[in-house]
């Protein structure tokens, strides 16, 4: 006596499963490329949004060449206070000797006048090359974008008078990326479920047609 074949053992389910796996693989590859491109684009837009205008860099460089350090530091503080960008966590202005001449953080003014120990800042002062990197702060579990840009004396591209150190919070960017990725994942799961159901229906029709006897007419 033939036992009844369970649905998951039937040819209908196997055909549908193969179709669903192929669809899942395709969506996974497309999703990986999509998320990577999205991250690249969002980060590029973010970096462009927080980039300081050239006139601010020029103003800071001018103050660093001033012999009146006290007045220059006040001007630097005023210039940094005009930078209105909530994504920027903090900006430092460091002179050619490695002395911190200003910070945008009102609660961190105590570092002004101190010599920086940051290796990246020191290297930028020496090699005259900008440096950018993404960092993860294990203390607060936040990701940051760090940019160190040399400040050049007016009319002399080889004379580094200081650097601008900028630190910006990336959590908003990755929150947007995660939200969009979640929407894509939800849509992909719905597509797979619908595809699985459609594949079952199609496989049933194909098998039903294959079992239909063919009548051969003879004359």
List where the protein language model places each region.
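Helix-start (N-cap) segments at beta->loop->alpha junctions
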Residues: 151-155, 165-184
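Extracytoplasmic/periplasmic sensor domains and loops in membrane signaling proteins
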Residues: 74, 105-139
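A short beta-strand signature within small-molecule sensing/ligand-binding domains used
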Residues: 130-132, 140-153
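Membrane-proximal alpha-helical signal-transduction linkers
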Residues: 205-219
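Glycine-rich acetyl-CoA-binding "A-motif" of GNAT/NAT acetyltransferases
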Residues: 160
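Cytosolic-side ends of inner-membrane transmembrane helices, especially those
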Residues: 31-37, 183, 187, 191-208
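Short glycine-/small-residue motifs
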Residues: 103, 163
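Juxtamembrane segments flanking the first transmembrane helix
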Residues: 2-99, 105-108
């Amino acid at each position: 006596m033939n036992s009844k074949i369970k649905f998951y053992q039937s040819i209908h389910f196997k055909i549908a499963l193969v179709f669903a796996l192929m669809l899942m693989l395709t969506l996974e590859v497309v999703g990986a490329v999509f998320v990577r491109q999205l991250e690249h684009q969002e980060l590029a837009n973010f970096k462009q949004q927080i980039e300081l205008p050239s006139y601010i860099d020029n103003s800071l460089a001018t103050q660093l060449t001033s012999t009146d350090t006290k007045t220059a530091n006040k001007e630097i503080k005023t210039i940094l206070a005009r930078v209105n960008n909530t994504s920027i966590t903090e900006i430092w202005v460091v002179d050619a000797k490695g002395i911190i001449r200003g910070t945008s953080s009102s609660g961190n003014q105590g570092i002004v006048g101190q010599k920086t120990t940051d290796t990246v800042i020191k290297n930028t002062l020496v090699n005259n090359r900008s440096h950018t990197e993404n960092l993860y702060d294990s203390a607060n579990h936040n990701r940051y974008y760090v940019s160190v840009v040399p400040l050049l004396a007016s009319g002399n591209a080889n004379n580094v008078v200081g650097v601008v150190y900028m630190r910006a919070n990336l959590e908003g960017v990755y929150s947007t990326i995660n939200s969009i990725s979640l929407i894509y994942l939800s849509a992909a799961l719905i597509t797979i479920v619908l595809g699985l159901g459609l594949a079952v229906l199609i496989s049933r029709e194909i098998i039903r047609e294959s079992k239909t006897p063919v009548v051969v007419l003879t004359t």
